[in-house]
From Swiss-Prot:
Domain of life: Bacteria
Enzyme class: isomerase
Family annotation (HAMAP family): Foldase_PrsA (MF_01145)
GO CC list: plasma membrane
GO biological process: protein folding; protein transport
Lipid-modified sites (N-palmitoyl cysteine): C19
Subcellular localization: Cell membrane
Family to which the UniProt record says this protein belongs: Belongs to the PrsA family.
Record-given protein name: Foldase protein PrsA 1
Keywords: Cell membrane, Isomerase, Lipoprotein, Membrane, Palmitate, Rotamase, Signal
Cited function: Plays a major role in protein secretion by helping the post-translocational extracellular folding of several secreted proteins.
EC number: 5.2.1.8
Taxonomic lineage of the native organism: Bacteria, Bacillati, Bacillota, Bacilli, Bacillales
Length: 286
């Protein structure tokens, strides 16, 4: 969120600064020629107008529809500031952004999380109520290699050694394929579904995902905590997962925009949200 939030704030500042003078006012003078506010606005609108307007509308709609406490905004803002360290103030000065502009973006982000939370059902929470498991895998590019690895495992060869020999996952191969502990929603669906069907020390058949073919071994299954104790964590994970789902987010935001009765008067941008609806319909047909 951090760099994106600064970028969003920067574009908002540009848009707002363009509105602060009359259209004929010069914002740049030089021997090569002057630039008026109107010229600047038209150029900005051509290059990034739809994205900037989309972000500004989304921000207003979310903040209006979902109440976020000031203390929560301050907490998230402080976390963000801490991550940037000494660079934070420098970045704000370089881009001409005020802290309040960043805080507005943070408020919109937290409001968005509330909007996503509202869509999560008890059924979804219970479906994702699974024990924390530890697994290792051997990731290969093709099915033939996966079958070869599986055959060698059947001959008694070490899973860890075969991971070092064959695995394409540079992050885990030198650890014998160890991925550590994870819960529901942390892995791609095909991997997760297969892993949760295994007993401790059981090895899967080759599992195909977008990354290739996995041979999975579950090495530990933790005792499951009571549902009420982990419900909040499950919800947080689902919010993060849904926020990465472009189709879900488009659908969610179009519903929010429809409720807000958004109308765009600028002739060049008036079809912005109609275009989004059309794009959503195309995605649904795929």
């Amino acid at each position: 969120m951090k760099k994106a939030m600064l970028a969003l704030a920067a574009t908002s500042v540009i848009a707002l600064s363009a509105c602060g003078t009359s259209s004929s006012d010069k914002i740049v003078t030089s021997k090569a020629g002057d630039i008026t506010k109107e010229e600047f606005y038209d150029q900005m609108k051509t290059q990034a107008g739809k994205q900037v307007l989309n972000n500004m509308v989304m921000e207003k709609v979310l903040i209006k529809n979902y109440k976020v406490e000031d203390k929560d905004v301050d907490k998230k803002f402080d976390e963000m500031k801490k991550q940037y360290g000494d660079q934070f103030d420098t970045l704000l000065k370089q881009q001409g952004i005020k802290e309040e502009t960043i805080k507005t973006g943070v408020r919109a982000q937290l409001a968005q999380e509330k909007a996503i939370e509202k869509t999560i059902t008890d059924k979804e929470l219970k479906e994702n109520y699974k024990p924390e498991i530890k697994a290792s895998h051997i990731l290969v590019k093709d099915e033939a290699t996966a079958k070869k690895v599986k055959e060698e495992l059947g001959q008694g060869k070490s899973f860890e050694e075969l991971a070092k020999q064959y695995s394409e996952d540079t992050g885990s191969k030198e650890k014998g394929g160890d991925l550590g502990y994870f819960t529901a929603g942390k892995m791609v669906k095909e991997f997760e579904d297969a892993a949760y069907k295994l007993k401790k020390d059981e090895v899967s058949e080759p599992v195909k995902s977008q990354f290739g073919y996995h041979i999975i071994k579950v090495t530990d299954i933790k005792e499951q905590k009571p549902f009420d104790e982990v419900k909040g964590d499950i919800k947080k994970d689902l919010v993060q997962k849904k926020a990465q789902d472009a189709a879900f987010m488009n659908d969610l935001m179009m519903k929010e925009i429809k409720k807000a009765d958004v109308k765009v008067d600028d002739k060049d941008l008036k079809d912005l949200f109609e275009e989004k609806k059309a794009d959503d319909k195309k995605e649904e047909k795929k």
